[in-house]
């Protein structure tokens, strides 16, 4: 059995619920290439591994408080061994490879995780979550054209999943200059695509603040933004969030947008109403920018 002695949890922002959950539910319907009885047993074993895995994660979070994680690591190693046995017994059971690959990714074993997901993709190339994870790996390795291809395939398979649009938007933004230098995009074209992807994610999940926030922030990332549209987005976010701290953060972005529009008096007026201590530094920076461009 392959053993992974260093368990490093990688809790990513904005992840789809763990594949183990969804694919555990689908396991009974997956084509394992085995006989019906062995297929049922494989589905049962996968479901059991999924449940043990979820339980171990919850216990791990509690164990971190008491610094008593050894027993949880032992359980995780047992689950790894269980996955190894399952994929050995059912080598064409795509749900097992996906669940195992996602687990390895979650505990920080990137390379073995990628290998499992590549195998899953070879067995069945129509799982968007696999394309997304393969794209993540390529992006982390700096292989941005390959990452873009995987993200686009994920979108093609699941066009209504906001995460995939968000992932592609982030990739295009992070590697913007590289895409332009490689002549894969023109400057205006990549700016348009970045905004389109973030806008699509926000539209598909309007109740999810991170997607809406990133779309609104994207107006500051492009060369020729529509500031009127940006101002409308920030006003909507002021009304959307509930906590006073979040409202003031959105108002500070509104002030920055007003400044970019040339409305320095309106920007200063908004800033005067912001008294959240955590925003003091950002507020001072913006005020200095305003005063430098519009000295009294």
What are these regions (language model features)?
Residues 96, 130, 164, 211, ...:
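TPR alpha-solenoid repeat register
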Residues 93, 102, 127, 136, 161, 170, 177, 208, ...:
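Residue-level recognition of tetratricopeptide repeat
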Residues 89, 123, 157, 204, ...:
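Structural marker of alpha-solenoid helical repeat scaffolds
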Residues 86, 119-120, 153-154, 200-201, ...:
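Canonical positions in the second alpha-helix
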Residues 72-81, 106-119, 140-153, 176-200, ...:
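Structural signature of tandem alpha-helical TPR/SEL1-like repeats
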Residues 22-84, 88-89:
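N-terminal leader/linker segments that initiate helical-solenoid repeat arrays
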């Amino acid at each position: 059995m392959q053993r992974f002695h260093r368990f490093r949890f990688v809790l990513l922002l904005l992840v789809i619920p763990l594949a183990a959950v969804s694919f555990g539910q689908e396991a009974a319907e997956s084509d394992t290439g085995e006989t019906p009885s062995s297929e049922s047993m494989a589905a049962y074993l996968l479901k059991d591994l999924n449940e043990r895995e979820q339980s171990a994660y919850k216990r791990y979070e509690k164990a971190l408080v008491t610094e008593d994680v050894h027993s949880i690591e032992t359980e995780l190693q047992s689950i790894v061994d269980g996955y190894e046995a399952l994929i050995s017994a059912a080598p064409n059971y795509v749900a097992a490879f996906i669940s195992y690959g996602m687990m390895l990714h979650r505990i920080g074993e990137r390379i073995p995780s990628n290998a499992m997901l590549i195998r899953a993709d070879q067995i069945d190339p129509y799982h968007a979550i696999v394309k997304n994870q393969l794209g993540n790996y390529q992006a982390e390795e700096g292989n941005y054209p390959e990452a873009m291809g995987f993200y686009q395939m994920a979108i093609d398979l699941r066009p209504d999943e906001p995460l995939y649009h968000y992932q592609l938007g982030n990739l295009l933004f992070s590697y913007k200059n590289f895409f332009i230098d490689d002549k894969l995009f023109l400057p205006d074209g990549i700016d348009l695509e970045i905004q389109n992807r973030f806008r699509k994610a926000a539209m598909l999940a309007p109740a999810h603040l991170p997607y809406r926030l990133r779309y609104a922030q994207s107006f500051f990332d492009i060369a020729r933004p529509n500031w009127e549209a940006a101002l409308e987005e920030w006003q909507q976010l002021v009304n959307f969030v509930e906590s006073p701290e979040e409202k003031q953060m959105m108002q500070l972005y509104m002030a920055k947008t007003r400044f970019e529009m040339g409305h320095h008096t309106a920007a200063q007026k908004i800033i005067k109403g912001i008294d959240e201590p955590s925003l003091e530094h950002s507020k001072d920076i913006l005020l200095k920018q305003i005063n430098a461009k519009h000295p009294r």
